Amino acid sequence: MSLFDHSVSELHKKLNNKEISVTDLVEESYKRIADVEDNVKAFLTLDEENARAKAKELDAKIGAEDNGLLFGMPIGVKDNIVTNGLRTTCASKILANFDPIYDATVVQKLKAADTITIGKLNMDEFAMGSSNENSGFYATKNPWNLDYVPGGSSGGSAAAVAAGEVLFSLGSDTGGSIRQPAAYCGVVGLKPTYGRVSRYGLVAFASSLDQIGPITRTVEDNAYLLQAISGLDRMDATSANVEVGNYLAGLTGDVKGLRIAVPKEYLGEGVGEEARESVLAALKVLEGMGATWEEVSLPHSKYALATYYLLSSSEASANLSRFDGVRYGVRSDNVNNLLDLYKNTRSEGFGDEVKRRIMLGTFALSSGYYDAYYKKAQQVRTLIKNDFENVFANYDVIIGPTTPTPAFKVGEKVDDPMTMYANDILTIPVNLAGVPAISVPCGFGANNMPLGLQIIGKHFDEATIYRVAHAFEQATDYHTKKASL
């Protein structure tokens, strides 16, 4: 039995009782990485020397003081979250050898909690993708079946947890990039409310949509990790000054009287029968525990995909303009003048998907098209947000599938961008509205790949999401299933 089959609270107890050491946990990670990483390819950079040194330092503290719950726990960090002195590439050749000079706020908080960073995790380049096939280095594979994608863009973060390489990880979610890979890899992934977790030190893709969040094996562990990284940060102008409650207190298993809304758009056209049936089965479980559900409508959901790609690509066009070969990152050698420097550095450094989105965003922001595309997309975004507010006036949570289907095979959709984009039709509306949502395992498809249940909550009401997710998790056994590599 792996140490990582235990929960955070169980491992914390074992550490305090000196049944195990922090070094044991770190070595568990690196041994598992040595065994499976050649196949999974979840990591881009390992930090073995520093991790082992930190483990020895923490071992000396066991029993000497009151250590927090995350003390000594091994974590993986998505490679678009900056780490001081530890290579951060965003899975892009343009940042292939970039060593940041500061830590992201979430990394500072994790260090303060005495977690140990095992390494940096693979992803779609600059978080643009749904399969991890857009990594500038190599594609991560799904631990449940190496012929399948792990999802994206936080594919490395989800795969590392599913493969038992780390206890938990951090990802980022712009249009589903935590929840979709969590669903595909059979783990738990939460996108917090926009502003709940500081974005300081997250390399920006789309600043009005990006949010850092936890990926774990269980809902309880997810709540522990969110508790540690949440809160106001003066270094992030979009960080919200909203009290962080005790997420663990609500994990009682009680959902009696809970009012669930199920959007007809989330079970209709484009959603596979397996995903639909898994949600209906989950609703029966929750109904049996005293919750009630009704069908509702989110009428503007049909515009979410187009709205998202216009807005996110427009923001990416602006955010990625900083990668020009002048200040940091790779610089082209094929240069005769300043224009060559900009053009050749970006042409050589960015992958095809990143270039595609930069071009789309630049077009949407260009003179003569701004009102027709970008401004109109912002107006539709407001309508989508209003849809959620109208539903939440009468219901506690919204439930539906995380993805339309289980994971697909490597290479199956890589040459068809529109088909690839459609994988996010159920997760994107959440980002546009800024509300929180979690994906928890809820079954398997005919291809024996995991399915995810998406539970969406009101702004800053992660506590209710966790309560529902935990109740469902404890009433079923999907969270006990493991990928067998």
Swiss-Prot record:
Domain of life of the organism encoding this protein: Bacteria
Reactions catalysed: L-glutamyl-tRNA(Gln) + L-glutamine + ATP + H2O = L-glutaminyl-tRNA(Gln) + L-glutamate + ADP + phosphate + H(+)
GO CC annotation terms, alphabetical: glutamyl-tRNA(Gln) amidotransferase complex
Catalytic machinery residues: 78 (charge relay system), 153 (charge relay system), 177 (acyl-ester intermediate)
Gene3D superfamilies: Amidase signature (AS) domain
E.C. code: 6.3.5.7
Keyword terms: ATP-binding, Ligase, Nucleotide-binding, Protein biosynthesis
An individual GO BP term: translation
Any Pfam family: Amidase
Keyword hit for Protein biosynthesis: yes
InterPro entries linked to this entry: Amidase (IPR000120), Amidase_CS (IPR020556), Amidase_dom (IPR023631), AS_sf (IPR036928), GatA (IPR004412)
Segments traversing the membrane: none
GO molecular function: ATP binding; glutaminyl-tRNA synthase (glutamine-hydrolyzing) activity
Primary enzyme class: ligase
Alphabetized HAMAP family for the sequence: GatA
Function: Allows the formation of correctly charged Gln-tRNA(Gln) through the transamidation of misacylated Glu-tRNA(Gln) in organisms which lack glutaminyl-tRNA synthetase. The reaction takes place in the presence of glutamine and ATP through an activated gamma-phospho-Glu-tRNA(Gln).
Protein family according to the UniProt entry: Belongs to the amidase family. GatA subfamily.
Self-association and partners: Heterotrimer of A, B and C subunits.
Protein name (Swiss-Prot/TrEMBL): Glutamyl-tRNA(Gln) amidotransferase subunit A
Encoding gene, per UniProt annotation: gatA
